[in-house]
Design a protein with these regions (language model features):
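Extracellular parallel beta-helix/beta-solenoid repeat domains
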Residues: 1-153
Length: 153
């Protein structure tokens, strides 16, 4: 996927989803798992997502509002401190070629695993737009496992 404005995949389903063997070069988040439990109620939180064997190449090069990480997970809910809107997301065996360090940004998630067979490679292909230095940003989450990531830095 490339040349798509704003984001790549917008996911929302309680059924099992497997995202595998894709190429992402997107101006915003490559994968956005979002929900609206506040106004439109358009989709539910996810319950079982596997993201594997994908190449994420230099995402988030567009407008700063288009993405907060290669994989961004959140929800439009007012009570973020106690809600765990999305559950059971596994990221395994992917390659992240990034100029922006933000790989994953999560809030309101219960159950997330980033396995050690993911590879992170840094590029200088674009100027960094964010001041964020962390690869993994989590807020109001439970049961988050970030195994030792592989990196060339």
């Amino acid at each position: 996927m490339r040349g798509n404005r704003a984001r790549g995949l917008l996911l929302g389903s309680r059924n099992r989803m497997v995202i595998e063997d894709n190429y992402f070069h997107i101006a915003g988040a490559a994968i956005l798992i979002e929900g609206d439990a506040n106004y439109w109620y358009e989709q539910s939180g996810v319950r079982d997502v596997v993201i594997r064997r994908n190449l994420f190449e230099n995402g988030n090069y567009g407008s700063p509002g288009w993405g907060s990480a290669c994989i961004a997970v959140g929800s439009g809910i007012p009570d973020r401190e106690t809600s765990r809107y999305h559950r059971n997301i596994r990221v395994e065996g992917n390659t992240f070629r990034v100029f922006d360090p933000r790989i994953v940004n999560l809030y309101c998630v219960d159950g997330f695993v980033f396995t050690q067979d993911n590879v992170i490679e840094y590029t200088d292909d674009y100027p960094v737009l964010s001041g964020e230095k962390r690869n993994f940003i989590t807020r109001n989450c439970d049961n988050i496992v970030i195994e030792k990531e592989q990196t060339d830095k």
